[in-house]
Amino acid sequence: MDLSTLKPVAGSRKSSTRKARGFSAGKGKTAGRGQKGQKAREGKKLRLSFEGGQMPLMRRMPKRGFNNISRKEYAIVNLDQLNKFDDGTTVSASSLKEAGIIKKELSGVKVLASGKLNKKITIHAAKASQAAQDSIKEAGSKIILTTETADSEN
């Protein structure tokens, strides 16, 4: 026995159909393409979205909205995630990234009020919800909003 003499089991491999090789092959003359028409000709095939000259679906649908080039996206941090830091720590976007709480700094950090803050820390953030600001003050912590439009300290 030799690797060069191995053959597949009889009936396990089906031979490919030889198209357009005479009527005795079973796929002669039109080679399974039907009669005349664009799809019976050789060359480039039609794209999937082609609808025979009818106005395509994607062009029939109305355009809507636009992409705002000055859109700001904030990294979201919840209050319960801030319990990871020790008392007296100053928490900023870079320290949140080092701690693995956020992946990217984006346009800044936004603090939301999910959970409860148990530590006394100073938080530097671009934005914070009103409920989050109230919870932070209630816990004895401090939040400093670092955007131009916000007050320098709340």
Swiss-Prot record:
Entry's Gene Ontology molecular function annotations: rRNA binding; structural constituent of ribosome
Region: Disordered, residue numbers: 1-61
Keywords from the UniProt entry: Ribonucleoprotein, Ribosomal protein, RNA-binding, rRNA-binding
Biological process (GO), any one: translation
InterPro entries: Ribosomal_uL15, Ribosomal_uL15/eL18, Ribosomal_uL15/eL18_sf, Ribosomal_uL15_bac-type, Ribosomal_uL15_CS
Listed GO CC annotations: cytosolic large ribosomal subunit
Record function comment: Binds to the 23S rRNA.
Subunit architecture: Part of the 50S ribosomal subunit.
Recorded family membership: Belongs to the universal ribosomal protein uL15 family.
NCBIfam families: rplO_bact
Name of the protein: Large ribosomal subunit protein uL15
Name of the gene encoding the protein in the UniProt record: rplO
